[in-house]
Amino acid sequence: MSKTVNFRATKNFYLQFVSVSSRDTSCIPCIHLFFDSKRYVFGSVGEGCQRAILSQQLRLSKIKDVFLMQGSSISSPDTYDSSSSSSTTSVSDMLQLDDRDKVIVSERNSMCSTVNYPTWWDSCGGFPGFLLSLNDISEPGETGEASPFVLHGPSEVHQFLSSMRHFTYHTNVNLTVQGYTSAEAPVFVDENICVTPVVVSLVKNSFKKRKHENINRGTNARPLKEDRANTSPHWYSHVSNDTSFVVENAMYNTPAPLEPDKPELFISYIVQSHPTPGKFDAAKAKSLGITKGLDCGRLARGEPVTLENGKTVYPKEVIGPSIPGSSFFIIHCPNELVIDLVIENHKWTNAPKPVCVIHSVTPEVYKNPRYQSWISSFPSEVSHLIASTEVNEVINYPRSAVAIATLNLLDSKVFPLGFNCYEVKNVQKNNRIAFAKPKLRFAFGKKTGIDDSEVGVSIEELKDKILKEKPDYKSFVEEAQKYVSDKPKAPSFAGSDIQICTLGTGSAMPSLYRNVSSTYVRIPVDKKCMEDSAISMKNILLDCGEGTLGRLSRQYGDNLKYEIASLRWIYISHMHADHHAGVIGVLKAWTKYSDGRSKLFITAPPQFEFWLLEYSRIDYLPLSNIVFISNSALRTDRKPSALESSRLSSLFKEFDLVSFRTVPAIHCPYSYCMEITNSSGWKIAYSGDTRPSEDFANIAKDSTLLIHEATLEDSMHEIAIKKQHSTYSEALEVAKKAGTKNVILTHFSQRYPKLPDIDISTEDLHIALAFDGMTLKISDISLFRYFGKPLAYLFNEENLKEESDPLKF
């Protein structure tokens, strides 16, 4: 049954770029459309999206519709089948494009590649966290109903939502789906806008109909129910176009795999606001005999009025012509193979003239003569906003960037700025064309046009500004640097040269200052033992929250290729999304940079295996290269199966381990604490999320390094018990019981960015407080105590209040 839509005539509204292609955000732009009554998102909800929305002080709860632009394909990367290209492309053109694609693929795998090519994960990789945050802040309506939210996009959105059921919920959000296919893409109309999807498709050759890969399992995981998945659409019966997404029979309603040759969709949009009614001509109405106010009202509402003399006055006689609404196009054309399909689509011809056109394109597409000719065909008064997939060196999270720059003054090695982070190019090319940046606006209405007044400035000048405005901080920094430089180098010990990089140090959801959980462990190895002498590390990720890949890219720049190629193990402590929602992005990068022969170990709860298997049915994952081991296989109170033992043996050999144990954490089901011990003598223990645990203290005994969550300050002990987390003092007490010498506290509550009230100057226990991007060797943790005064000054509440607009000068 159709519902009545009451149109709102709104002349003034604007769109704003939340993110563009960068090291830590999706290569598909995220565009926020603002009306008084509600907000919309077009483009992507990629990793880092909700943090960028928060950083720009936009209201997540006001967003009611998201329109995605990129479809999925289960084929391997870069295997486009040119036979599905436009019929107007000649055979020679196809061959040339195929060759060009080969060059592009080669460039993608080069160390200095700066161009991203969209995948399904780029489109919606941040949606799990987005949905959880939206659910937390949404409130029921007046009659108790859940807050409405519609996700528009390719039909595989259904499968994607179903695969997320192991770790997402939305009891406060009535989530519905509007799926598009190449044959059917209905127009969306609400009180503010009319949205027409423009869908084109391209077939990828899927390894020439590759078979569905199997993950190398080290568990007794229950297989997916293929019979139910393939015989009918019952697997998504709990996701429909007119009902909320409800989890039912979670272990069995599994996504049906996409057909091997299912076309990949590229969706553009025509967006138009509703026309403004013409003005009521009171003088003309009076001349026609209309004298009563009620009659004027009826005419204004479009109703005819019959006078006492029998004459009928019609609205068109007293109301001027309506003013057409404003229109804009969002073009998604990330591949040269679909240029003709996009630009020759009949819907552009039939659409109203746009005020502006947004181009989500690769550099190759933008420079293509055919595409340039199409841009030139628009009237000269039309503005063009170019959102290239080329990596932009922009600041997406200003307060975090300011904190990192300030910490960098204290110690540039422990708190590196990151590679190429802070270059900001000119936004506007000319009056007609502008390159999109975060916070760039385009206004419609009285002040139609580009507004770049809010676009952030370069942060390179920030260090001098900080030192000038915070003279006390400068003196604290100089004092700390003197202590560190005067201290003799600590003697080496087993594991002293292991490097720890705390990529994400906050809890629950991203914040202005901290991203969610991820700790990167870089273990040096003997180059002589390696086939590739350039790779001198074997790396581990301890948890992998949303945005982990982005932080790695910021941290290591063009060396990201080597870091990812050296990644051998991902450990997931439990199934909360803030600890694992970044794994798919890392796997995508690992596929791109690994040699194709390497194995990647993943130890995680069994539900995580289901997530990977089901997600791989809608998007490519390198499952044949993954060795999965359930965390429960390592429990001290049980013996692993023969298959688990075989997988564990390979893991032990890879890292030269003599011990790897887990114990149940005092947190959610299937959550674990762990320790690993190397044959050389070093030992690392990691708590994950937990209340203080005697069992963990026991397996962490005499560890070289203990990494422990410290979510809440000591005054919030009751909340810590309720939420099953640890306070600062409780975490340190576990470290003391374990007899460890070095401890890193992390996973701080996002409620407050201030520094924990902890004495870090102790000699017997070396304490480091984790910050995003902090990098230090285990042997350097003992120097962290000299940073106490400058850190306390930097993160006191008064200084934080002063940073209301940290990038403004």
Swiss-Prot record:
Function recorded in the entry? Zinc phosphodiesterase, which displays some tRNA 3'-processing endonuclease activity. May be involved in tRNA maturation, by removing a 3'-trailer from precursor tRNA.
Q: Name one GO molecular function term.
A: 3'-tRNA processing endoribonuclease activity
Region called Disordered, residue ranges: 74-93
- State the Gene3D superfamilies in the record: Ribonuclease Z/Hydroxyacylglutathione hydrolase-like
Is-annotated flag, keyword Transmembrane helix?
Answer: no
Which residue stretches, if any, does this entry annotate as coiled coil? none
UniProt keyword list:
Cytoplasm, Endonuclease, Hydrolase, Metal-binding, Nuclease, Nucleus, tRNA processing, Zinc
Q: Where in the cell is it found?
A: Nucleus; Cytoplasm
The similarity comment for this entry is: Belongs to the RNase Z family.
Report the protein name in the record: Ribonuclease Z 1
Pfam families named in the record: Lactamase_B_4
Q: Which GO terms describe its cellular component?
A: cytoplasm; nucleus
**Database matches in CDD domains:** RNaseZ_ELAC1_ELAC2-C-term-like_MBL-fold
Essential cofactor(s): Zn(2+)
Q: What is its EC number?
A: 3.1.26.11
Annotated organism of origin: Schizosaccharomyces pombe (strain 972 / ATCC 24843)
InterPro entries hit by this protein = RibonucZ/Hydroxyglut_hydro (IPR036866), RNZ2-like (IPR047151), tRNase_Z_dom (IPR027794)
Give GO terms for biological process: tRNA 3'-end processing
Catalysis performed (reactions): Endonucleolytic cleavage of RNA, removing extra 3' nucleotides from tRNA precursor, generating 3' termini of tRNAs. A 3'-hydroxy group is left at the tRNA terminus and a 5'-phosphoryl group is left at the trailer molecule
